[in-house]
Amino acid sequence: MTNRVADRPAALANPVAIYTTGLLGMGYADFYIFLIPLYALSLGMSAGEIGVLAGARHLLPVFLSIHVGVLMDRFGTRRVSLFFVWLAISLAPMFPLLPWFWPLMLLQIVNGGALSFGWSGSQTLIAQLTEGDAEYLGRFNFFARIGTTIAPIVVGGVWDLGGAWPAYLIGVAWGMLLTLALLRAPEAQIAPGGRPGVGHSERRWARFQLRDTLPRVSDYIACFSLVAIPAVAMTLALFFLRNAGNGIQFSLYVVYLKQINLTGTTIGVLFSAIEITSALGSLFAGRAMRIGDPQRTMLSGTVLSILLICATPFLGGVFVLLLLAQVARGWLQGVVQPMIFSVQAKAVGRYRQGAVVGLRQTMNRLSSILIPPIMGAIADWWSVTASFVVLGGFLLLMCIPIVRLIRRAAASAIAEEAPEAT
């Protein structure tokens, strides 16, 4: 333990602020994910309209996550993150003022982007400050999971007590707390030409110009070129498969559980179980990086996670078995996620953390958009049970080429940082 404290990055001498950004940042996004269906239902909107509103938050992150990540690398992660957190704070009181579908959808698109980019900033900042250390990334993920657990409870209770206005004003307060955490967190080094890292005598910021708000094709090309790094390609593929399992859970998994007559409370217990065990598993990620082969651990953990979610129809509807499957899957995902982040962070170098987080967020949003409708189409064509089998088999087949990527990553010494950007 003494050696770990001695080896702690200087920027984490007091890690409370950066861990707090994890708790509040991820919880901030989940706060609105939970709130928008409640608000739309109170306005009498149809299920189709609610579905469109829920999905609208993904629109900007799909196209702009890479651009925002590059801005973080160029102008400072904390600086860019604060802008989007302040944007979300300013938009929160507008929700109760807009009871119409189209204005609400436009607001949801912009606010969803702001929340996503703010959370990306927290992920980028911890990767920069920890230099990709899986143990600290795991602790950050642990606190983030706490945020996702308490946010729905808080907003649900406030909604029951006072409705839309108090709930969205709590969103303002949540954003202000996140602002304080970011202001107390240290800024990381940015690329040459921007502000130097903490401890340098010079305090020069890169000058922001209006044209910097526009995405550049060259930035996207440079970002996608990171996929040429075997470690990045391998971890992006694993991250897509991991999120595909989550896409199954948030779509037809719930449908299946309702078909076997589980109550809403029971389903909630299953969802809480995976969040809790995922948080606990995150604390083991650093040790897993040290005691085993990280690449093989990530692949085997992802394969087992896919098997556990796709085996749902074959558990006989027995609650104990369903619970054990969720506990095991949560633990595996909790261990694997910080390892993925760590391998990526070490592979790309300190000045491209925002870009790789943006690339990862793009893959995340794509899997969230693609998997539920594909699975729904399979269920409509055959059955819900068949959709688990067909999609599960396809996802497992996708793991085969990852073995080749793992071998390439090992051959290219993924622990060595990529050349620094100039």
Task: Kindly give the residue locations of the regions a language model identified.
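Helix-to-loop junctions at the C-terminal end of transmembrane segments
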Residues: 63-76, 159, 281-293, 379-380
